[in-house]
Design a protein with these regions (language model features):
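C-terminal tail/sorting-segment detector
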Residues: 537-557
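Conserved beta-propeller blade signature
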Residues: 7-8, 42-44, 77-80, 125-128, ...
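Short, conserved, GDST-rich strand-edge loop motifs in beta-rich repeat architectures
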Residues: 127-144, 195-198, 249, 290-299, ...
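Single conserved hydrophobic/aromatic residue that forms the stacking wall/gate
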Residues: 1-13
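Residue-level detector of Asp-centered blade-edge/turn motifs that repeat once per structural unit
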Residues: 37-39, 72-75, 120-123, 178-184, ...
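Glycine-centered coil/turn sites that cap beta-strands in beta-rich domains
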Residues: 468-500, 518-521
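Signature of short aromatic-glycine-proline-rich micro-motifs recurring in repeat-based ectodomains
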Residues: 110-118, 168-178, 220-233, 271-276, ...
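Glycine-centered tight-turn motifs at strand-turn-strand junctions
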Residues: 509-531, 542-546
Length: 557
């Protein structure tokens, strides 16, 4: 095709072919989303039509179908993918006439690939798509849905239902929390970057809070969709805190009685992209601004018995353990580990504060921080994830840090911060993308959910929540058969238990420390040799309890 003809074709919408240096239209003024060969025919998919060409003169047109993909399995019989409407088979009955052969097959799965924020509650996983860019420069313009997984099936609170009930189209969800009211009804709150705060009671849209019915404000007095809310978090008393960007009072609180409160925080008022609220174990509230401008900072808010008055402390700069200045351009996420240390994600890597109470002092402008330093294969020390954009940090029950990045996948740091336990990316794992949005952990099972821009995966983690006693300890698989050569999981332990495995004569075979309430044994002794067939005793104790046999494991070699 000549360049002039090619240029002409590319300016048009439709289907064209060239004959004798002449461009001939087959379908005009219709945008085509996909084209593919099916059998010996050409299928062209528009927004609500499909054209199936036998040749340049003969084609069938199927109307009122939004087909994402098509494949043939017999002459004039096709499988069609209709997105959320499922998978169907159709057959040709005549010119432009098709009929469905089967009911739509709808696969059980998430409503959206985007897993912007995830929360685990009551052995259910709640996911929202979203939201806004890491720097807050723009929103993703995604319809708001809440996807819920109960380990058997998926359900979804669709945006159309919210539109019908609340007369507001939900979009750009940013954070989600789940609780129960006094009558044990499930309550879901979802914040939005422009549309306020949404409330669902027992999976039904109940309310949308914005400037018309609450103290929530629109950015800089703008009308329309500028009620920018984020950072949902419950404090120790059950009050719901949230950030409200670009307004006169940046912190809003919906107390457990349903009354609203507004807090004026000088370092946050009027600022762009106020992100998360981390409620620490001592009920302080850590708040980050992620936009890479002079506004980027961390703020700690403390309040005693009042939700209408608080003291705040702002800081931006750090001095690391090598006495170097550490001043990132933006603060992206926060977490508290089991030692009470505060971890902070930035555009230059992750740091942690071993004495976070110093942040609530007047002299906090150059806080001391620790940057994780590891040793490479050549014996040379290096800063862990130096100059890497950190998107999320989650701490498991073994005090290991799951760190998500913007393009490098997930890293798991050991309890003592001296070793990379796991490194997951699209090259070595089922991760669907290396651009990680969110990480959440089911504390009861240890399962880790990793959300990205392209979908959700889960990993059977080794750390679970510790039990109060040893009354329900068990191991699986048990017995361990010859074909099973991976790991044996011992679960139901108390936190940080010392676990010993012995033979029936009391000889020590293996010893480890539990990760929260769970320990792993690879059926090998201390020399790395797989143990002989037999029954092995599992003994466990904490620093405050007496050692006892908690379960047995049968190994068949």
């Amino acid at each position: 095709m000549r360049s002039s003809a090619a240029s002409d074709v590319y300016k048009r919408q439709g289907i064209y072919y060239e004959s004798n240096e002449t461009t001939v239209p087959l379908v005009s003024n219709t945008q085509m989303n996909n084209m593919k060969i099916v059998g010996e025919k050409l299928a062209c998919m528009a927004t609500s039509q499909v054209y199936i060409f036998t040749d340049t003169k003969t084609f069938d047109q199927i109307n009122n179908l939004s087909i994402k993909d098509i494949s043939t399995y017999q002459t004039d019989k096709y499988w069609i993918a209709e997105g959320s409407k499922g998978l169907r088979s159709i057959q040709r009955k005549g010119a432009n006439q098709f009929e469905a052969i089967n009911e739509a097959i709808i696969l059980d799965g998430p409503y959206s690939n985007s897993s912007y924020d995830i929360v685990s509650k009551n052995d259910k996983i709640y996911i929202i798509p979203g939201g806004k860019s890491l720097t807050g420069d723009n929103s993703f313009n995604k319809a708001g849905s809440v996807m819920i997984y109960d380990y058997e099936k998926w359900s979804v609170l669709e945006p159309s239902v919210v539109q019908n009930k609340l007369n507001t189209w939900p979009k750009d969800y940013t954070s989600i929390v789940v609780t129960k009211n006094d009558t044990e009804k499930e309550i879901i709150y979802v914040s939005s970057f422009g549309y306020g705060l949404f409330q669902f009671i027992d999976r039904e849209p109940s309310a949308v809070y914005n400037k018309t019915n609450s103290p929530l404000e629109n950015a800089h007095g703008n009308e329309g969709f500028y009620c920018r809310v984020d950072g949902l978090a419950f404090d120790k008393e059950g009050n719901l805190w949230m950030t409200n960007s670009e307004v006169s009072k940046a912190i809003k609180i919906l107390d457990k009685e349903g009354k609203w409160h507004s807090l004026s925080v000088e370092s946050l008022n009027g600022k762009y992209t106020i992100n998360d609220i981390l409620v620490t174990s001592n009920n302080d509230k850590w708040i980050n601004i992620s936009r890479p401008t002079s506004q980027a900072c961390l703020t700690v808010v403390t309040n005693s018995n009042s939700l209408d008055e608080a003291t705040s402390y702002e800081f931006k700069n750090f001095i690391d353990t090598d006495n170097n200045d550490f001043s990132p351009n933006n603060y992206t996420c926060m977490a508290e580990d089991k030692n009470g240390y505060i971890w902070i994600g930035t555009n230059k890597g992750a740091i942690y504060l071993t004495n976070p109470k110093l942040a609530t002092t007047e002299n906090n402008q150059s806080m001391r921080c620790t940057r994780v330093k590891l040793i490479n294969e050549e014996g040379i020390p290096y800063y862990f994830l130096d100059n890497t954009i950190i998107t999320t940090i989650k701490v498991d029950n073994g005090n290991r840090k799951w760190i998500g990045t913007d393009g490098s996948g997930v890293y798991v740091l050991s309890e003592d911060n001296q070793e990379i336990v796991h490194q997951f990316n699209t090259s070595n794992s089922p991760l669907l993308s290396d651009k990680i949005y969110s990480i959440e952990i089911n504390e009861n099972t240890g399962e880790v959910f990793i959300g990205s821009d392209k979908g959700l995966v889960s990993y059977k983690g080794e750390a679970t929540k510790g039990k109060d006693d040893y009354s329900d300890v068990y191991a699986y698989p048990n017995p361990v058969r010859p074909e099973y050569r991976d790991k044996v999981t011992i679960t139901g332990l108390m936190d940080n238990s010392i676990v010993k495995i012995t033979d029936l004569n009391g000889n020590l075979v293996y010893q480890t420390k539990s990760l929260g309430g769970q320990a792993i044994w690879n059926c090998r002794n201390t020399k790395g040799v797989r143990v002989a067939s037999g029954v092995y005793l599992v003994l466990s104790a904490t620093e405050d309890s007496k050692e006892s046999v908690v379960t047995k494991i049968a190994v068949i070699k």
